[in-house]
């Protein structure tokens, strides 16, 4: 089975081709928003045809960040999906409008090839009511579609699936309590019971939660109001600061990556690391409490190679608190990149 994975970003389009599960080509089309999705996809098609990916009609998988409650799982990219995306775009216009544009271009450039959409939020559609609900008026929540989401659902779902499989091989209970830690540009922690998430660190947007590479993470709303008002930044300026100039980069004073902060001996990185690891400890404790204990710990994400740094800081605290089961200290790594996780959705669903 051949699969073409497309991951549109704000400025670039990543692609990867797979034949029988093995990656045959990968690359990035930069400036694709400027040249237009049709031109970028024409370029991708030329590349994948040259390596023989189209010799056997491939499945095309398009990555989406936000799918709302309309997309509880991967969905065929057809007219019905586009109608639903238009509806979802009212909730998250920044995330979805560009996806609609590229989805239409996929239908044109890869006409006749089966295509599907896979969303990061799908895994979190069924978060428990107590977890997804904000303490504001239900009428207002409904009107504005306010609720909590997770934004690394593809990693969390794949990692917890593998952790559950390993757990069952031990002849243990069928629904392990999993602490899933995704180490990415915007790190995220989720508590998963078997295959269902019950808590997650992010919220209505990725701004809530742990500090990221440029994202402040959870912050008192009054701070945002002060930045917009007293500091004179205005709403757009405050948002730009909290989303693009804060987090680990804000603490260090220059643009940094998560792995730099977790491994560097520079004093400014050490300070940022202390803040991040403390927040991760608190979030892990919350997840463990919600689960009633932890049977398995699994790491995933772009920076999974830094898992040991986090594990050595967080897990001893959980163990002393009596939150870890007999095998939870034997943490594991789910090392597949996002491109492979997306390719797997073509066969798993």
Language-model regions: role of each:
Residues 230-274:
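A mobile "lid/hinge" subdomain adjacent to the ATP/sugar-phosphate binding pocket shared
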Residues 51-99, 113-116, 121-133:
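Short beta-strand-loop/turn "lid" adjacent to the catalytic site in phosphate-handling enzymes
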